[in-house]
Amino acid sequence: MNVRRPTPDDLAPAVELLRAVEEADTGEAEWDERQLREHWSTLELEHDVWLFEVDGRLAGYADLEVRPGGRVMSDGYVHPELRGRGVGSEILRLAEEEARRRTDADGGRLYLQNATTSHADGFYRSRGFSPVRRFRRMAIELEREPEVDVPPGVVLRTIHRGEEPAIHALLEDAFAEHWEHRRRGYEEYAERTFDRGDYDPTLCPVAEVDGVLAGASLNWWKDMGDWGWIGTVGVVPAFRGRGIGEALVRWSFAELFRRGERRVALGVDAQNETGAARLYERLGMRTLWEAAVWEKELRGAAS
C-alpha cells in the first residue's frame, strides 16, 4: 500500500473514488469536482489529506480538520472494489495518530462519519468508537406544485441582492446551538454559497415578521444532477413555533417544481432538537440513507 499527499492533479480521480463509494453505500453519487475543489480550499493538502493506493489503483481517501476544544473531524473513504485490503484500518490509524499529534492534552476527541451499514458499525465499534450523532439524506418526489400556507403576520419573499450579509448573520444565529456548529465569517461562508456561480437569490425564500428577518432557505437548482437541493433552512430561535420553517420548505418545493424539478433532497441532523427531521417527514420526505458520526476519546500523547 502506498500512502501519499494529493496534488491538484488528483482532483478528478479523487472525485471518481468518492462517487464510487457513495454509489455503493447509499445508491446516490453526489460529489463532483466543484464540491471537492471547494472542500480542498479549506484544507492544506500537504498536511490534511491522504490518498491510499493499492496495486497502482486509488483505493482510499481521507482528510482531517482540527476544531476548537480538542475536536478533530475526519472523513475516510475506501473504494468498494478494494475493501478488505487493510485500507480502512490504515485510514483510522493515520487519523488517530495525526489527531493525537495535533491535540496537545488528553481529552481530545476524534470524530468520523460514515454511511450506516452493519459492516461499518462493527468496524468502528471494534476500534473503540461509539456513535454520537446521526444524519439523514431525505428526498421527495413532487407530483404537483405544493400549496404554500403563509402563517399570519409572516411575509415570504426572495433574497434581495446586497442583503446576503444579513442572511448569513440570520443563519449563523439559527444554527448557533446546532451540534458541532462552527461559526464562520461572511467571506468564508459566501465562498460556498453566495459567491457560487449557480447562486440564484430568486430561488431562496426569506421570512420576515414586522420587518425583521426571521428565517431563510438557501436552495439550488439541479445541484445534484436532476435533483433540486435545499441546502440550508434556518429560523432564528425567537420566531420558532410559528410555522415559518414549514412555509419556507413548502415555498422551496413549489419554486423548484415551477422550474422543472420533480425530485428535491436535503440533509438533516436526525437528532436536531428543533424537530427538523419530523417536519420533513410530515411534508412527505423519505429517508434515502443515514450516516453516523463516530467518536473516540483520545488518551495519551502521540508516540
How should these model regions be labeled?
Residues 1-37, 149-183:
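Short amphipathic alpha-helix that is part of the acyltransferase structural core
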Residues 6-55, 60-63, 69-72, 93-96:
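N-terminal charged segments
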Residues 25-45, 62-70, 178-234:
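A conserved beta-strand-loop-helix scaffold within acyl/acetyltransferase catalytic domains
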Residues 48-51, 203-206, 250:
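Hydrophobic beta-strand residues of extracellular immunoglobulin-like
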Residues 65-152, 292-296:
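Acyl-donor-binding surface of acyltransferase catalytic domains
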Residues 66-76, 83, 106-107, 201, ...:
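A conserved beta-turn-beta hairpin within the catalytic core of GNAT-like acetyltransferases
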Residues 84-100, 232-236, 241-258, 263, ...:
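Conserved acetyl-CoA-binding loop-helix of GNAT-fold acetyltransferases
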Residues 136-157, 262-274, 284-303:
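C-terminal "cap" of GNAT-fold acetyltransferases
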